[in-house]
Amino acid sequence: YVQFVSNVMYSWVWGGRNMSGSLEYYFNGFGQSDGRYDPISLANNPDLLVRLSRGELFTLGRHYLSANVMIEMSPLWILTPTVFMNVEDPSALFQLVTTYSLSDNMTLLGSVNIPIGPGGTEFGGIESGLPDRYLSRGAGLFAQFAWYF
């Protein structure tokens, strides 16, 4: 099986703010070749399931695009919107990450994660095997305070 990642990155100044954007393509040779995420189709791909259970992979499909822009709101505050898209189905994950440096040894990190897509898609919710029931994480919020000493 083959896995492949390609990335392009560019930095610039816009509106007096430092910006850095990237576009990335990821190919997962272990992913579902037919784009079906129902329990029977997934069970027929044991190589994928083993790698998911071991934490070696985090995606079900084969083709993904990711785009993000890091915006330096101030020298201490960085805001980064990111979208992860499954190219083979109409689903994506939108993530907004913020980092604020409270001092030389303290940082506050937060993110909002919003899955986008209809039921039956990777980020919208994969089929559970029960009628009209999908396995999905839903929107999420994360916060972390880090103190370095």
Task: Indicate residue ranges for each PLM-predicted region.
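Outer-membrane beta-barrel translocator domains and adjoining extracellular loop/strand segments
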Residues: 1, 33-40, 83, 92-97, ...
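Long, well-ordered mid-to-C-terminal structural blocks that present hydrophobic/aromatic surfaces
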Residues: 1-48
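Residues that define the transmembrane beta-barrel architecture of outer-membrane proteins
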Residues: 2-4, 61-65, 90-94, 137-141
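Transmembrane beta-strands of outer-membrane beta-barrel pores
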Residues: 12, 25-31, 71, 83-89, ...
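Repeated loop/turn-to-beta-strand initiation elements of outer-membrane beta-barrel proteins
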Residues: 15-21, 75-79, 105-110
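Membrane-embedded beta-strand positions of outer-membrane beta-barrel proteins
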Residues: 21-23, 69, 81, 98, ...
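Extracellular loop and loop/strand-boundary signature of outer-membrane beta-barrel proteins
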Residues: 51-55, 82-84, 128-133
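Outer-membrane beta-barrel "beta-signal"
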Residues: 112, 133-149
